[in-house]
Protein backbone atom coordinates (compact mmCIF):
# COMPACT_ATOMS: atom_id res chain seq x y z
CA UNK A 1 0.00 0.00 0.00
CA UNK A 2 1.37 3.41 -0.98
CA UNK A 3 1.94 6.19 1.55
CA UNK A 4 -0.91 8.17 -0.01
CA UNK A 5 -3.34 5.24 0.31
CA UNK A 6 -2.30 4.76 3.93
CA UNK A 7 -2.95 8.45 4.51
CA UNK A 8 -6.40 8.16 2.91
CA UNK A 9 -7.18 5.12 5.08
CA UNK A 10 -6.05 7.01 8.17
CA UNK A 11 -8.28 9.97 7.28
CA UNK A 12 -11.25 7.62 6.82
CA UNK A 13 -10.66 5.96 10.20
CA UNK A 14 -10.52 9.41 11.80
CA UNK A 15 -13.99 10.17 10.40
CA UNK A 16 -15.40 6.86 11.67
CA UNK A 17 -14.02 7.37 15.18
CA UNK A 18 -15.19 10.98 15.33
CA UNK A 19 -18.60 9.95 14.01
CA UNK A 20 -18.90 7.58 16.98
CA UNK A 21 -17.53 10.20 19.37
CA UNK A 22 -20.46 12.59 18.86
CA UNK A 23 -22.81 10.09 20.52
CA UNK A 24 -20.37 8.46 22.97
CA UNK A 25 -19.22 11.79 24.44
CA UNK A 26 -22.82 13.01 24.55
CA UNK A 27 -23.68 10.08 26.84
CA UNK A 28 -21.11 11.37 29.34
CA UNK A 29 -22.11 15.04 29.20
CA UNK A 30 -23.71 16.74 31.00
CA UNK A 31 -25.26 14.03 33.21
CA UNK A 32 -22.03 12.65 34.67
CA UNK A 33 -19.31 15.11 33.76
CA UNK A 34 -19.44 18.75 32.68
CA UNK A 35 -17.89 19.54 29.31
CA UNK A 36 -14.95 21.53 30.69
CA UNK A 37 -14.18 18.92 33.32
CA UNK A 38 -14.28 16.26 30.60
CA UNK A 39 -11.80 18.30 28.53
CA UNK A 40 -9.31 18.45 31.41
CA UNK A 41 -9.55 14.67 31.70
CA UNK A 42 -9.34 14.19 27.93
CA UNK A 43 -6.37 16.49 27.29
CA UNK A 44 -4.57 15.44 30.47
CA UNK A 45 -4.93 11.75 29.65
CA UNK A 46 -3.80 12.23 26.05
CA UNK A 47 -0.83 14.38 27.16
CA UNK A 48 0.31 11.61 29.50
CA UNK A 49 0.01 9.02 26.72
CA UNK A 50 1.99 11.12 24.23
CA UNK A 51 4.82 11.73 26.69
CA UNK A 52 4.95 8.06 27.77
CA UNK A 53 5.14 6.89 24.15
CA UNK A 54 7.81 9.50 23.39
CA UNK A 55 9.93 8.35 26.36
CA UNK A 56 9.53 4.68 25.34
CA UNK A 57 10.50 5.37 21.72
CA UNK A 58 13.39 7.60 22.78
CA UNK A 59 14.82 4.95 25.11
CA UNK A 60 14.59 2.37 22.32
CA UNK A 61 16.33 4.63 19.81
CA UNK A 62 13.31 4.84 17.51
CA UNK A 63 13.16 8.63 17.38
CA UNK A 64 15.48 11.03 15.57
CA UNK A 65 17.43 13.46 17.72
CA UNK A 66 15.69 16.51 16.30
CA UNK A 67 14.96 19.36 18.67
CA UNK A 68 12.29 22.01 18.37
CA UNK A 69 13.72 25.24 17.02
CA UNK A 70 13.09 28.23 19.27
CA UNK A 71 11.50 30.03 16.32
CA UNK A 72 8.87 27.24 16.02
CA UNK A 73 7.62 27.46 19.60
CA UNK A 74 5.19 30.32 18.80
CA UNK A 75 3.70 28.06 16.12
CA UNK A 76 3.40 25.24 18.67
CA UNK A 77 1.66 27.60 21.12
CA UNK A 78 -0.70 28.70 18.35
CA UNK A 79 -1.40 25.06 17.41
CA UNK A 80 -2.17 24.30 21.06
CA UNK A 81 -4.47 27.32 21.33
CA UNK A 82 -6.50 26.62 18.17
CA UNK A 83 -6.20 22.82 17.97
CA UNK A 84 -6.52 21.94 21.66
CA UNK A 85 -7.90 24.76 23.82
CA UNK A 86 -10.48 26.61 21.70
CA UNK A 87 -11.24 23.58 19.53
CA UNK A 88 -11.94 21.10 22.33
CA UNK A 89 -13.52 23.48 24.84
CA UNK A 90 -16.02 24.81 22.31
CA UNK A 91 -16.70 21.40 20.77
CA UNK A 92 -17.46 19.55 24.00
CA UNK A 93 -19.42 22.43 25.52
CA UNK A 94 -21.39 22.76 22.29
CA UNK A 95 -21.97 19.01 22.04
CA UNK A 96 -23.24 18.94 25.63
CA UNK A 97 -25.92 21.48 24.63
CA UNK A 98 -26.94 20.22 21.17
CA UNK A 99 -27.50 16.89 19.41
CA UNK A 100 -24.90 14.56 17.82
CA UNK A 101 -26.30 14.96 14.29
CA UNK A 102 -26.50 18.77 14.44
CA UNK A 103 -22.92 18.99 15.71
CA UNK A 104 -21.66 16.67 12.97
CA UNK A 105 -23.47 18.63 10.25
CA UNK A 106 -21.94 21.93 11.39
CA UNK A 107 -18.45 20.37 11.39
CA UNK A 108 -18.88 19.88 7.63
CA UNK A 109 -18.29 23.63 7.26
CA UNK A 110 -14.60 23.11 8.17
CA UNK A 111 -13.41 22.62 4.53
CA UNK A 112 -14.99 25.95 3.58
CA UNK A 113 -13.34 27.61 6.55
CA UNK A 114 -9.94 26.14 5.64
CA UNK A 115 -10.23 27.49 2.09
CA UNK A 116 -11.23 30.96 3.33
CA UNK A 117 -8.35 31.05 5.80
CA UNK A 118 -5.96 29.79 3.12
CA UNK A 119 -7.17 32.55 0.81
CA UNK A 120 -6.62 35.18 3.50
CA UNK A 121 -3.24 33.88 4.66
CA UNK A 122 -1.90 32.88 1.24
CA UNK A 123 -3.59 35.79 -0.57
CA UNK A 124 -5.37 33.47 -3.01
CA UNK A 125 -8.21 34.96 -5.06
CA UNK A 126 -11.73 33.76 -4.24
CA UNK A 127 -13.85 32.86 -7.29
CA UNK A 128 -17.55 33.75 -7.56
CA UNK A 129 -18.45 30.05 -7.33
CA UNK A 130 -16.60 29.79 -4.03
CA UNK A 131 -18.31 32.90 -2.67
CA UNK A 132 -21.71 31.44 -3.65
CA UNK A 133 -20.81 28.21 -1.85
CA UNK A 134 -19.75 30.10 1.25
CA UNK A 135 -23.05 31.98 1.32
CA UNK A 136 -25.04 28.73 0.99
CA UNK A 137 -23.01 27.11 3.75
CA UNK A 138 -23.45 30.14 5.98
CA UNK A 139 -27.24 30.12 5.41
CA UNK A 140 -27.43 26.40 6.22
CA UNK A 141 -25.33 26.77 9.36
CA UNK A 142 -27.29 29.83 10.52
CA UNK A 143 -30.59 28.02 9.87
CA UNK A 144 -29.46 25.06 11.96
CA UNK A 145 -28.21 27.28 14.78
CA UNK A 146 -31.43 29.33 14.94
CA UNK A 147 -34.08 26.69 14.26
CA UNK A 148 -32.50 23.28 14.83
CA UNK A 149 -34.38 21.55 17.61
CA UNK A 150 -32.99 18.41 19.18
CA UNK A 151 -34.17 15.42 21.13
CA UNK A 152 -32.98 13.89 24.36
CA UNK A 153 -30.70 15.92 26.62
CA UNK A 154 -30.06 18.83 24.24
CA UNK A 155 -30.71 21.77 26.54
CA UNK A 156 -29.74 24.72 24.32
CA UNK A 157 -29.35 23.66 20.70
CA UNK A 158 -28.82 27.20 19.36
CA UNK A 159 -25.89 28.04 21.65
CA UNK A 160 -24.51 24.52 21.29
CA UNK A 161 -24.52 24.73 17.50
CA UNK A 162 -22.83 28.16 17.63
CA UNK A 163 -20.05 26.78 19.85
CA UNK A 164 -19.54 23.85 17.47
CA UNK A 165 -19.19 26.37 14.62
CA UNK A 166 -16.53 28.29 16.58
CA UNK A 167 -14.80 24.95 17.12
CA UNK A 168 -14.83 24.32 13.35
CA UNK A 169 -13.28 27.74 12.67
CA UNK A 170 -10.59 27.11 15.27
CA UNK A 171 -9.85 23.69 13.76
CA UNK A 172 -9.46 25.34 10.36
CA UNK A 173 -6.76 27.61 11.79
CA UNK A 174 -5.07 24.60 13.37
CA UNK A 175 -4.90 22.62 10.10
CA UNK A 176 -3.03 25.47 8.43
CA UNK A 177 -0.72 26.22 11.38
CA UNK A 178 0.37 22.62 12.01
CA UNK A 179 1.25 21.73 8.40
CA UNK A 180 4.77 23.21 8.57
CA UNK A 181 5.52 21.47 11.86
CA UNK A 182 4.65 18.06 10.44
CA UNK A 183 7.05 18.47 7.54
CA UNK A 184 9.83 19.65 9.85
CA UNK A 185 9.67 17.29 12.83
CA UNK A 186 8.79 13.75 13.78
CA UNK A 187 5.19 13.64 15.04
CA UNK A 188 6.11 12.71 18.63
CA UNK A 189 8.78 15.42 18.73
CA UNK A 190 6.27 18.25 18.65
CA UNK A 191 2.89 16.72 19.52
CA UNK A 192 3.88 16.19 23.15
CA UNK A 193 4.61 19.91 23.43
CA UNK A 194 1.38 20.88 21.66
CA UNK A 195 -0.67 18.81 24.10
CA UNK A 196 1.30 19.90 27.17
CA UNK A 197 0.75 23.56 26.26
CA UNK A 198 -2.90 22.82 25.48
CA UNK A 199 -3.37 21.10 28.85
CA UNK A 200 -2.26 24.20 30.76
CA UNK A 201 -4.59 26.29 28.60
CA UNK A 202 -7.70 24.21 29.40
CA UNK A 203 -6.83 23.59 33.06
CA UNK A 204 -8.23 26.90 34.39
CA UNK A 205 -11.58 26.24 32.68
CA UNK A 206 -12.19 22.71 33.91
CA UNK A 207 -10.18 21.96 37.03
CA UNK A 208 -12.75 23.35 39.45
CA UNK A 209 -15.55 21.42 37.73
CA UNK A 210 -13.43 18.25 37.57
CA UNK A 211 -12.89 18.32 41.35
CA UNK A 212 -16.64 18.33 42.04
CA UNK A 213 -17.38 15.10 40.13
CA UNK A 214 -18.83 12.33 42.32
CA UNK A 215 -17.03 9.37 40.76
CA UNK A 216 -18.84 6.91 43.04
CA UNK A 217 -22.10 7.34 41.10
CA UNK A 218 -20.50 7.08 37.66
CA UNK A 219 -21.39 3.66 36.13
CA UNK A 220 -18.77 1.41 34.56
CA UNK A 221 -20.20 1.98 31.07
CA UNK A 222 -19.47 5.70 31.36
CA UNK A 223 -15.89 5.02 32.43
CA UNK A 224 -15.46 2.92 29.27
CA UNK A 225 -16.86 5.77 27.18
CA UNK A 226 -14.51 8.26 28.83
CA UNK A 227 -11.66 5.88 28.06
CA UNK A 228 -12.78 5.65 24.42
CA UNK A 229 -12.72 9.44 24.07
CA UNK A 230 -9.26 9.74 25.65
CA UNK A 231 -7.59 6.82 23.84
CA UNK A 232 -9.33 6.56 20.47
CA UNK A 233 -10.95 9.96 19.87
CA UNK A 234 -7.92 11.90 21.08
CA UNK A 235 -4.69 9.86 21.17
CA UNK A 236 -5.23 7.49 18.22
CA UNK A 237 -7.11 10.03 16.10
CA UNK A 238 -4.43 12.66 16.58
CA UNK A 239 -1.77 10.23 15.35
CA UNK A 240 -3.95 9.18 12.40
CA UNK A 241 -4.51 12.85 11.55
CA UNK A 242 -0.77 13.49 11.58
CA UNK A 243 -0.18 10.45 9.36
CA UNK A 244 -2.77 11.64 6.85
CA UNK A 245 -1.58 15.26 6.85
CA UNK A 246 2.01 14.25 6.09
CA UNK A 247 0.87 13.04 2.66
CA UNK A 248 -2.31 15.06 2.07
CA UNK A 249 -3.01 18.79 1.91
CA UNK A 250 -5.05 20.52 4.65
CA UNK A 251 -7.90 20.95 2.15
CA UNK A 252 -7.94 17.21 1.35
CA UNK A 253 -7.88 16.24 5.03
CA UNK A 254 -10.70 18.69 5.73
CA UNK A 255 -12.82 17.12 2.98
CA UNK A 256 -12.92 13.84 4.95
CA UNK A 257 -15.01 15.67 7.55
CA UNK A 258 -17.86 15.17 5.05
CA UNK A 259 -18.00 11.55 6.23
CA UNK A 260 -18.53 12.44 9.89
CA UNK A 261 -22.26 13.32 9.62
CA UNK A 262 -22.87 9.99 7.86
CA UNK A 263 -21.21 7.93 10.59
CA UNK A 264 -22.60 10.17 13.36
CA UNK A 265 -26.15 9.82 11.99
CA UNK A 266 -25.92 6.04 11.62
CA UNK A 267 -24.53 5.65 15.12
CA UNK A 268 -26.87 8.15 16.84
CA UNK A 269 -30.09 6.94 15.19
CA UNK A 270 -29.25 3.25 15.63
CA UNK A 271 -28.88 3.85 19.38
CA UNK A 272 -31.95 6.10 19.57
CA UNK A 273 -29.88 9.10 20.68
CA UNK A 274 -31.07 11.50 17.97
CA UNK A 275 -33.51 11.82 15.09
CA UNK A 276 -33.66 13.42 11.65
CA UNK A 277 -36.10 16.26 10.96
CA UNK A 278 -36.80 18.80 8.24
CA UNK A 279 -34.54 21.49 9.66
CA UNK A 280 -31.55 19.15 9.86
CA UNK A 281 -32.14 17.79 6.36
CA UNK A 282 -32.55 21.26 4.81
CA UNK A 283 -29.53 22.64 6.68
CA UNK A 284 -27.47 19.62 5.62
CA UNK A 285 -28.46 20.12 1.96
CA UNK A 286 -27.46 23.81 2.06
CA UNK A 287 -24.16 23.13 3.83
CA UNK A 288 -23.20 20.21 1.57
CA UNK A 289 -24.11 22.25 -1.53
CA UNK A 290 -21.93 25.08 -0.28
CA UNK A 291 -19.03 22.75 0.46
CA UNK A 292 -19.35 21.20 -3.02
CA UNK A 293 -19.16 24.60 -4.73
CA UNK A 294 -16.25 25.79 -2.61
CA UNK A 295 -14.13 22.65 -3.05
CA UNK A 296 -15.02 21.94 -6.71
CA UNK A 297 -11.82 21.86 -8.73
CA UNK A 298 -11.63 24.17 -11.73
CA UNK A 299 -11.93 22.13 -14.94
What residues fall within each predicted segment?
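Helix-helix packing/entry segments at the starts of transmembrane helices
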Residues: 11, 15, 41, 84, ...
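Transmembrane alpha-helices of multi-pass small-molecule transport proteins
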Residues: 31-86, 113, 170-177, 191-210, ...
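Hydrophobic transmembrane alpha-helices of multi-pass small-molecule transport proteins
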Residues: 50, 126-148, 202, 258, ...
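Hydrophobic/small/kink-forming positions within alpha-helical transmembrane segments
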Residues: 19, 23, 80-85, 89, ...
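Specific transmembrane alpha-helical segments of multi-pass solute transporters/efflux pumps
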Residues: 17, 21-22, 54-102, 107, ...
Amino acid sequence: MTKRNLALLAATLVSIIYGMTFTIAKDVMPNYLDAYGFIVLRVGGATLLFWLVWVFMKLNGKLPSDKISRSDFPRIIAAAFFGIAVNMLCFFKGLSLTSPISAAVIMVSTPMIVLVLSAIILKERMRKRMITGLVLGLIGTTFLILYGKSVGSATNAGLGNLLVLINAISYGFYLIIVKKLMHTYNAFTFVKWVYLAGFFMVLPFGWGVFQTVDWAIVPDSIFWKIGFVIFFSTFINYLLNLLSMKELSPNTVAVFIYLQPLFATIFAISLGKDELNGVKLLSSALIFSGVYLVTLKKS
